[in-house]
Swiss-Prot record:
Its EC number is 4.2.1.9. Belongs to the IlvD/Edd family. It comes from Streptococcus thermophilus (strain ATCC BAA-250 / LMG 18311). The gene is ilvD. This is Dihydroxy-acid dehydratase. It catalyses: (2R)-2,3-dihydroxy-3-methylbutanoate = 3-methyl-2-oxobutanoate + H2O; (2R,3R)-2,3-dihydroxy-3-methylpentanoate = (S)-3-methyl-2-oxopentanoate + H2O. The lineage of its organism: Bacteria, Bacillati, Bacillota, Bacilli, Lactobacillales.
Amino acid sequence: MEENIVSENNMKHRSSVYDSMVKSPNRAMLRATGMTDDSFEKPIVGVISTWAENTPCNIHLHGFGQIAKEGVKDAGAWPVQFGTITVADGIAMGTPGMRFSLTSRDIIADSIEAAMGGHNVDAFVAIGGCDKNMPGSMIAIANMDIPAIFAYGGTIAPGNLNGKDIDLVSVFEGIGKWNHGDMTAEEVKNLECNACPGPGGCGGMYTANTMATAIEVMGMSLPGSSSHPAESAEKKADIEEAGRAVVKMLEMGLKPSDILTREAFEDAITVTMALGGSTNATLHLLAIAHAANVDLTLEDFNDFQERVPHLADLKPSGQYVFQDLYNVGGVPAVMKYLLKNGFLHGDRITCTGKTVAENLEAFDDLTPGQKVIMPLENPKRADGPLIILKGNLAPEGAVAKVSGVKVRNITGPAKVFDSEEDAIEAVLSDEIVDGDVVVVRFVGPKGGPGMPEMLSLSSMIVGKGQGDKVALLTDGRFSGGTYGLVVGHIAPEAQVGGPIAYLRTGDMVTVDQDTKEITMHVPDEELAKRKAETELPPLYSRGVLGKYAHIVSSASRGAVTDFWNMDKSGKA
């Protein structure tokens, strides 16, 4: 029988593996990191961040990790800091590097699970700043199911040019305006030099802020934390408090599976609809739900789309940035408003150990007279802005974001491209005319590989004044900064022989947000003929993208990498 030479601590559920006499060699290495007899008696709490110097979203996160460690120490546990990767979407956008963006979500999840599991931590805090950091962290948190909290690095402050707030999307759209002759190269350079004034995630209701909000709503980050700006005193305080709070979770025996219930995901979808969040929320919430063993489907999003109005006048389709929401009460004030009106489940438990309703009691209502959140009686849109479409072009579904779009349906000729680069060249060469349906395919999860975003392309179309006149369809994704008549996540994707693979330039296509249909007007006989004539390209086969292409699921299932439906050959 092994002799424990470290005193018993009922919070050391996992790190107690180091306590016995035969683990003396393990402790010898840990002593070299600063651990002592005293610290061996404490639970070990990991603090893992996606710090990197290459992007404002993450450049400040190493320091935030140090702050979180202080909170862990203050609560009586032993903190250990780790790092994992990030891919900056705004920097990778429109380049071959964009194929690594969604791929990085699952690498982040796997690396967190490997590091936390490999070192037997009792609990952990995950700190993220850019788009895929949030769902990557949450997939790991759900899979590990040990006490954990996510802490968001915070939103960037808006840039300012000539007295007007601007952000990164202003620069992307500036390229379209420059190409159209509405802006000079010098004016675009002025946008470039003033759009990003410091650290923080992209400033509108884009993917980073959408997912940070969703995680707070679900109860896996501290109340109010998602809307605290990156450079605010409140942000530093909530990062430190996250360290203390995760130790409290450990004391209470509170696990992610207690928090990540079906009702938690319903509330996340509700607030995403009300705030006009990113299309990527569908993909990421499906993936997190899969990790949490919660039954969630694309069809569920339409259920909430039909009954939750769009209230927030936030970018990309509105005029305000996320910091403006913070200034009028932040996410808790929005949640209080929705809870009072029967849209949320107030009795759910959260990472504080309190219910949603109990947490919200500590926060003020929306600032009287504010303009960021519109009243339920006069919403920005009567229903939600994220719509799941189905039809013979997308039998498994597709995701449309229709906030700010005046046109409710369009039927037009397809202009089909097998890469974003070719589509961009066509836009810049004025080959795309009003009424066209631009289609970019073979860029899905397997085909990209990595399901790249099309912000460069969509922003150019908007910048040229065609945002309401040209539809853009893809089996890839759109940035949270995208708006206009756009449909992404078309499934099945072209790479696996989805109908989009057989669409040809000139075919008529209908997108209808009222009937939630997406249709290619091609007779079945002609479609069968095209299938017989078409040879699909081989899957990418090298390196991490090759691995990803071979194991990733359909976008309709969240593009997850641990969903297998094995046949007799053992092939996925």
